[in-house]
Amino acid sequence: MPSIRLADLAQQLDAELHGDGDIVITGVASMQSAQTGHITFMVNPKYREHLGLCQASAVVMTQDDLPFAKSAALVVKNPYLTYARMAQILDTTPQPAQNIAPSAVIDATAKLGNNVSIGANAVIESGVELGDNVIIGAGCFVGKNSKIGAGSRLWANVTIYHEIQIGQNCLIQSGTVVGADGFGYANDRGNWVKIPQIGRVIIGDRVEIGACTTIDRGALDDTIIGNGVIIDNQCQIAHNVVIGDNTAVAGGVIMAGSLKIGRYCMIGGASVINGHMEICDKVTVTGMGMVMRPITEPGVYSSGIPLQPNKVWRKTAALVMNIDDMSKRLKSLERKVNQQD
């Protein structure tokens, strides 16, 4: 279990310490579950009333909240961001031994950097290059001539097809498949003719991809995931999609082929986005958005009808279904009124 003096933690976080710097911090916890040795954080003033009951040894908070502190405190401008950084310092995620499991199958032509770890039953094919400190989990498959940059980690049972490039310090969770064939077919009088998918997938640095997500290889050009992109679980990224730097994609999103998304976008969960179009930088699509046309202006976009009681929803749906007829009737009435005038 990691541990650190509160004063040392404050220094690493560039936080202002109030209280005993010799307190030993052993973990991060919520305000409700924290015990002695834990540090917690407060991001909303409405939780001030809970500070008296909180048993944490220290709390991360803003200057405005400091008068309400009942324990040692670290004062920062952004408690939530500080929480993320101190959670990294006190991370308890298991780290594998820096070795290669006897059951791993590694082609003789593969190039392995220093301190590479390869888990049981993993397969590394010919021409693969693994950078320094790469971790390949048990049961992973890395196809021919693929490259994985230094410090990247594949959790168990990740599949990386041939000719894929993954940058440095990336994290890919279990069950994800990168580089499978895109959905490319031509129709010959009712019969589907497969189009070989000869593009690649290029993933930048510091990319994180959740569990059971699929990123298809390009048909001709490459599918590209920019630097700093984060993609949640169970997303489908079709062939030739380009996602710009530092864009965030929540769970269950489906992106059709040849879509281009700009930088610093946020795509809400379960959204569906049409292909062969562009979304500009700094666009937010709220959850379950259906994006059928290009977006050319930054901003927040939504679609669909939010949850309603069923009886109300049925009436709303009926109104929507009849809106064209009602519009025609209204225009007809307007013409009659104008004629009377």
Curated annotation (Swiss-Prot):
Pathway-wise, it operates in: Glycolipid biosynthesis; lipid IV(A) biosynthesis; lipid IV(A) from (3R)-3-hydroxytetradecanoyl-[acyl-carrier-protein] and UDP-N-acetyl-alpha-D-glucosamine: step 3/6
Q: Which InterPro entries match?
A: Hexapep (IPR001451), Hexapep_transf_CS (IPR018357), LpxD (IPR007691), Trimer_LpxA-like_sf (IPR011004), UDP_GlcNAc_AcTrfase_non-rep (IPR020573)
What name is this protein filed under?
UDP-3-O-(3-hydroxymyristoyl)glucosamine N-acyltransferase
* Domain of life, per lineage: Bacteria
Record site feature (Involved in determining the hydroxyacyl-ACP selectivity), residues = 290
Q: Which residues form the active site?
A: 239 (proton acceptor)
The UniProt entry's GO CC annotations, sorted and at most eight, read: cytoplasm; cytosol; membrane
Q: Which GO terms describe its molecular function?
A: identical protein binding; N-acyltransferase activity; UDP-3-O-(R-3-hydroxymyristoyl)-glucosamine N-acyltransferase activity
Keywords assigned by UniProt, alphabetized: Acyltransferase, Antibiotic resistance, Lipid A biosynthesis, Lipid biosynthesis, Lipid metabolism, Repeat, Transferase
Check the record and name the NCBIfam families matching this protein. lipid_A_lpxD (TIGR01853), PRK00892.1 (NF002060)
Does the record bear Repeat in its keywords?
yes
Question: What's the reported outcome of changing residue 165 to R?
Answer: In firA200; confers temperature sensitivity and reverses the rifampicin resistance of rpoB mutants
- Give its E.C. classification number: 2.3.1.191
Activity regulation reads: Inhibited by divalent cations such as Ca(2+) and Mg(2+).
Provide the function of this protein.
Answer: Catalyzes the N-acylation of UDP-3-O-(hydroxytetradecanoyl)glucosamine using 3-hydroxytetradecanoyl-ACP as the acyl donor. Is involved in the biosynthesis of lipid A, a phosphorylated glycolipid that anchors the lipopolysaccharide to the outer membrane of the cell. Prefers (3R)-3-hydroxytetradecanoyl-ACP over (3R)-3-hydroxyhexadecanoyl-ACP as the acyl donor in vitro, which is consistent with the structure of E.coli lipid A that contains over 95% (R)-3-hydroxytetradecanoate at the 2 and 2' positions.
How is this protein organized at the quaternary level? Homotrimer.
- Family from the record: Belongs to the transferase hexapeptide repeat family. LpxD subfamily.
Origin species, per record, is Escherichia coli (strain K12)
Q: What is an annotated GO biological process for this record, any one?
A: lipid A biosynthetic process
HAMAP family from the xrefs?
LpxD
Name the enzyme group at the top EC level: transferase
Recorded hits in Pfam families, A to Z, give: Hexapep, LpxD
Q: Which residues cross the membrane?
A: none
